[in-house]
């Protein structure tokens, strides 16, 4: 039987330092008979030499286009714009199955080349629950940035750091009045919500946690009565949003949105008051200037779509620990394990919908 070949590509996004598989987990794949190739990367938080020492084959940056046809190409964020046709099996977060911006172009590239997109977001168990995610650290960083902004201690541009440095900033925020804030975490019991809660506790911020029951019957005034909203809700079907433009003119305490989910361009956006991401260089954008006579404060948003990369080492280690056992499932005798089959079905459905809509 031909060994499964996993090819860990470099990331094309300049601020992306995470890795889907860390050096410490490479031997687990090699011991299972896998072939592991790692591209050189000047920005990855783990040195290429660490992968070589773990037994991986090292190749040049961006050479995945010449990888063997049967290789699984692993990454984190979007592919570069070239080539126009994709013929490998790619594993990464594509954000292309819910009508997001550029989704059609991404799917077209796979359709032209005959490749397949196994989106990590759609690796799910038999109950439909995601089995791999960066959610905890996304929530942690998103909530942390919200607190720092509210206490006037957020400094741009942002850059990656170890967790102890971020925690020191949160502790300082706690001494700068964070305990007087009120924070609301939607999706508070999920991975991202738990991470957000942990960061807020570190800063000493009182936290309200809403989950499905509380958000199903939304209490809009209660939501507006918090200083910080950390949105950690992911939905695959359009539903009633938490905050709409008309809400911003009402009397409110709310001053900062930290949109961890960051599904800003699709129909499942739970915060349609914002339709653009923010960046490491400009992490905060003003959404509403406020109106003192109506009791409305200025409202700002933080909507960074790769939050965990601000803590790249911790985020990668946790993610790799979750993903590596499922990579082993690619070599099961009866074919790839259930989560990979689920991701494959999601891709097939997205392509069928593209063809049904008249995509070229």
How does the language model describe each region?
Residues 77-78, 94-95, 233-238, 261-262, ...:
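Short glycine-/small-residue-rich Rossmann-like dinucleotide-binding loops
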Residues 212-295:
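Rossmann-like adenosine-cofactor binding region
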Residues 71-153:
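Phosphate/diphosphate ligand-binding glycine-rich loop within oxidoreductases
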Residues 116, 121-171, 262-360:
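Adenosine-phosphate binding glycine-rich loop
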Residues 3, 87, 179-182, 254:
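Phosphate-coordination loops involved in phosphoryl transfer and adenosine-cofactor binding
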Residues 2-109:
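An N-terminal-biased, well-structured beta-alpha scaffold segment characteristic
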Residues 10-41, 153-234:
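Glycine-rich phosphate/diphosphate-binding loop of Rossmann-like nucleotide-binding domains
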